[in-house]
Amino acid sequence: SIPTDATLDLDEQISQLMQCKPLSEQQVRALCEKAKEILMDESNVQPVKSPVTICGDIHGQFHDLAELFRIGGMCPDTNYLFMGDYVDRGYYSVETVTLLVGLKVRYPQRITILRGNHESRQITQVYGFYDECLRKYGNANVWKYFTDLFDYLPLTALVESEIFCLHGGLSPSIETLDNIRNFDRVQEVPHGGPMCDLLWSDPDDRCGWGISPRGAGYTFGQDISNQFNHSNSLKLISRAHQLVMDGYNWAHEAKGGTIFSAPNYCYRCGNMASILEVDDCRNHTFIQFEPAPRRGEPDVTRRTPDYFL
């Protein structure tokens, strides 16, 4: 575990971040180095114990992440599992991702952070994180530290051997969790193939595999979910990646759930957000929340394309 002076240092950084104040470039660099050491030891299918609170996309909506912690409890009092998409689109990607990585370094056993499709060099150059780093630091170094770190994030997690958690969805190239365990994940998100599918695919009402309108990943039907759950002794697939107006929805006869944790997404969608609490007995409860009160959003024009709205 971390020596006391380092711990005090980190605690100070976390409380600074909780006030939505970014760290210095040097602090971010050191933090990412420590985080990399921790993440290197985690599996592509990272085991997680209950009780745990499972969260979906945050997308740089820092004040709503603070609201999530207010409702769900602060780390380390509550164990958390975040399913990716910390950056892009919102105005505070830097503060959001730095806080989550800071919590990971401080409480590695209490928080699990997975990779989303936005935790990629290519996507962040289009949807805002790269530009935000330039604006806040005057150069791209912080963007580079984080995007290098993103390559080490686990792709999926398994809660108590029965709830399979990941950002996007299933892949026609993956039949078992062991298939996923055998990937080399330390790379930029590929344009196709199984690793890409885990971060990009979506459940669908139609059976079988379908072409995804997103241009990456696949759509998959209830028959596919059932087969995967059966082959891997799973009760539930929990994922994020899609805006849902109630903050959550069930698909595939409650064998699959979507969790979205960015309320009033892009500051204009009017949706609720939710988190999923899994207790010691593995009962699960969705908790909905609304946006945190806004105190003067920066006036940033939206020039980024909306690839799914």
Swiss-Prot record:
- Which residues hold Mn(2+) 2? D85, N117, H167, H241
The text of the family note is: Belongs to the PPP phosphatase family. PP-2A subfamily.
* Entry-linked Pfam families: Metallophos
The record's section on PANTHER family has:
SERINE/THREONINE-PROTEIN PHOSPHATASE PP2A-RELATED
**What Gene3D superfamilies does UniProt report for this protein, alphabetically?**
3.60.21.10
> Which domain of life, per UniProt?
Eukaryota
**What EC class does the entry list?**
hydrolase
The record describes how the cofactor is bound as: Binds 2 manganese ions per subunit.
Q: Which UniProt keywords apply?
A: Hydrolase, Manganese, Metal-binding, Protein phosphatase
- The positions flagged as active site in the entry are H118 (proton donor)
| Record SMART domains | PP2Ac (SM00156)
User: Cytoplasm as a keyword?
Assistant: no
What does it catalyze?
O-phospho-L-seryl-[protein] + H2O = L-seryl-[protein] + phosphate; O-phospho-L-threonyl-[protein] + H2O = L-threonyl-[protein] + phosphate
- Which source organism? Brassica napus (Rape)
For whether the record's keyword set contains Manganese, the answer is yes
This entry's Enzyme Commission designation comes to 3.1.3.16
Cite the GO molecular-function annotations of the record.
metal ion binding; protein serine/threonine phosphatase activity
What is the protein's name according to its record? Answer: Serine/threonine-protein phosphatase PP2A catalytic subunit
Q: What is the lineage of its organism?
A: Eukaryota, Viridiplantae, Streptophyta, Embryophyta, Tracheophyta
What cofactor is needed?
Mn(2+)
Q: Which residues are listed for Mn(2+) 1 binding in this entry?
A: D57, H59, D85
